[in-house]
């Protein structure tokens, strides 16, 4: 199982130009999830092109085949394309099955990002995702973590 990185570690990796084809942004803290998604989109696509090569799906309304098809497309006027699946925890099991082959061999020019408050570790999809994706931990911060986090955020 891949170890999870913090929001700060994600920002450090992105500032060094280190990107992965698969990310799982997981945790109950909505603000941290949204900030991680924003940082990923900006780092992967740049400031002005975030909508042109970015596709957004919602787990409760998405087809696994459609997500894979979209992720397999070539980026236009950019080095990368980004596919975001919000509420990935709500993807039906049959749609998750369609994603398994892609998780084994992701497209190098696409970053697929799954975001959810929590994922069910019993599912094959979640097990495959935790083995192959960069896991970004967006759990609520403990009291001692708030002040350093606020300082770092204010510096940006």
Show the residue positions of the predicted features.
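Conserved beta/loop motifs at nucleotide-recognition and modification sites
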Residues: 1-156
């Amino acid at each position: 199982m891949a170890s999870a990185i913090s929001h700060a570690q994600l920002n450090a990796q992105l500032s060094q130009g280190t990107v992965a084809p698969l990310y799982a942004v997981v945790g109950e803290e909505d603000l941290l999830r949204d900030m991680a998604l924003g940082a990923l989109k900006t780092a992967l696509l740049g400031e002005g092109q975030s909508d042109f090569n970015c596709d957004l799906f919602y787990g409760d309304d998405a087809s696994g085949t459609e997500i894979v098809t979209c992720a397999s497309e070539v980026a236009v006027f950019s080095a990368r394309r980004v596919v975001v699946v919000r509420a990935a925890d709500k993807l039906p099991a049959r749609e998750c099955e369609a994603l398994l082959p892609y998780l084994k061999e992701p497209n190098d020019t696409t970053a697929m990002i799954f975001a959810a408050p929590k994922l069910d570790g019993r599912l094959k999809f979640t097990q495959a995702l935790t083995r192959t994706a960069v896991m970004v931990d967006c759990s609520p911060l403990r009291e001692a973590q708030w002040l350093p986090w606020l300082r770092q955020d204010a510096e940006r």
